[in-house]
């Protein structure tokens, strides 16, 4: 939808905007936009908001360099709030935190301990560390070495998985597979591919008689 007449701005001419990392799915921040800010966002794909305290439009990262390239914009069912899905550069929060929502009021008492949930959490942590590059972080060190370094690690870990499987060493196979998955998730994050993108490919290969092979068609 590009017809802004369907948006319900409040009496001050503003609409709340929730901003989400398009890669990890993490909620980064919540702000407001006026009509001009929304129009500028749609025209430039630069996340643009309206500051209620300063009474002016502002572009995320214009001063800090922590920019947000807008991948897509969505409107909720009532037309009175927006979702910006962005590619975040650096931390989103002015405190230096990856997300403005870093202070829990209620902790998750039953986190998803299955493979899906674990991979999503690890991927989210990787994208957060890539955004902030904290000193001493393994992710930061890998990133500093360039993509070739992590690709070499993937090759090494794949070899370890093969060896552990050949030796039928279950504990070692689980450990080496975890290492392989971690470094693969890192490579995905570096090039902007999410676990959801991979899941979509796998789901597309599901046939009535089971998973289709990578080369199978139809």
Swiss-Prot record:
Residue numbers spanned by region Phosphoribosyl-ATP pyrophosphohydrolase: 119-218
Enzymatic reactions: 1-(5-phospho-beta-D-ribosyl)-ATP + H2O = 1-(5-phospho-beta-D-ribosyl)-5'-AMP + diphosphate + H(+); 1-(5-phospho-beta-D-ribosyl)-5'-AMP + H2O = 1-(5-phospho-beta-D-ribosyl)-5-[(5-phospho-beta-D-ribosylamino)methylideneamino]imidazole-4-carboxamide
Broad EC category: hydrolase
CDD domains assigned to the protein according to its UniProt record, in alphabetical order: NTP-PPase_HisIE_like
Any GO molecular function: ATP binding
Electron transport keyword on record: no
Annotated region (Phosphoribosyl-AMP cyclohydrolase), positions in chain: 1-118
GO biological process: L-histidine biosynthetic process
Chief subcellular location: cytoplasm
UniProt cross-references to InterPro entries, sorted A to Z: His_synth_HisIE (IPR023019), HisE (IPR008179), PRA-CH (IPR026660), PRib-ATP_PPHydrolase-like (IPR021130), PRib_AMP_CycHydrolase_dom (IPR002496), PRib_AMP_CycHydrolase_sf (IPR038019)
Pfam family, one: PRA-CH
GO cellular component: cytoplasm
Gene3D superfamilies: MazG-like (1.10.287.1080), Phosphoribosyl-AMP cyclohydrolase (3.10.20.810)
EC number: 3.5.4.19, 3.6.1.31
Name by which UniProt lists this protein: Histidine biosynthesis bifunctional protein HisIE
Organism this protein belongs to: Deinococcus radiodurans (strain ATCC 13939 / DSM 20539 / JCM 16871 / CCUG 27074 / LMG 4051 / NBRC 15346 / NCIMB 9279 / VKM B-1422 / R1)
